[in-house]
């Protein structure tokens, strides 16, 4: 939303071709590779357990069967498998690209007050995951036969689209005031996320949904942390040429980094676990290690293939 809204005047097909095709082909290629990986481990004689080491969500259900890989590949047009969990975001991204030209037409005509009203209603919708957990599963007209409740048309990631567009106009606050507000917002969001997740993690009866509730992306605590980063970055000025080049390269490689990184999560967890670091250290060390490896691989692909790498890495 910060970069693309409002969408510039162009035919609908031109926008879709430029945006969707750029993510569609890498998405399909990497989805197939992730789903063929279990079969490949069997071809080269590796034990079946290595699949669970790479992809934790399939532990206990590992299969090196080619037919099982083909079944998962056949499901790509409908949903992701547990071997490429991170692809959930690409299905979402394609949906946002489909929606964006229509949303942009409203943004072009809406005044600041109308955008603010939309954002406030969206903020209210962010409490729905918690209300659904602690008040009632069915809220505001939803039922087994109707999943579209009162706030449905304001809910979801389109709020982040509008938020990005709204905050890119900047603010007149001083650097100190902006950083203080960002710190308070981030601390508030992080404390809710950490406290809720920790409580679920220490509860033997907690379900997978309980574990994930407090880092649901469309929730008020995640919004607080996201907005904090948005506001803080607005005050950052980068003038060092080497850093500018590095950031530009990261931007270029960003989609490829995302495509590749899930192959590295399991091995990185096992590798860094051998160093007996405290958990608060393991997580950032693992994140940095995965990022650098994925960035290096993606940059290498661009160096070898040039512009053709876009079809594979995005």
What are these regions (language model features)?
Residues 8-18, 103-115, 167-180, 236-248, ...:
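Membrane-interface helix-boundary motifs at transmembrane edges
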Residues 172-248:
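Alpha-helical transmembrane segments and terminal signal-anchor/GPI-anchor hydrophobic tails
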Residues 5-6, 38-45, 52-137, 147-169, ...:
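Hydrophobic alpha-helical segments with transmembrane-like composition
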Residues 236-251, 262-314:
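C-terminal "closing" transmembrane helix and its immediate cytosolic amphipathic cap
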Residues 1-19, 30-54, 237, 264:
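Juxtamembrane transmembrane-helix termini
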Residues 131-141, 194-207, 268-275:
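Juxtamembrane "helix-exit" motif on the non-cytosolic side of transmembrane helices
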Residues 31-32, 121-134, 184-199, 257, ...:
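Aromatic-anchored segments of alpha-helical transmembrane domains
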Residues 1-2, 92-100, 155-165, 223-233, ...:
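Hydrophobic cores of alpha-helical transmembrane segments in multi-pass inner/ER membrane proteins
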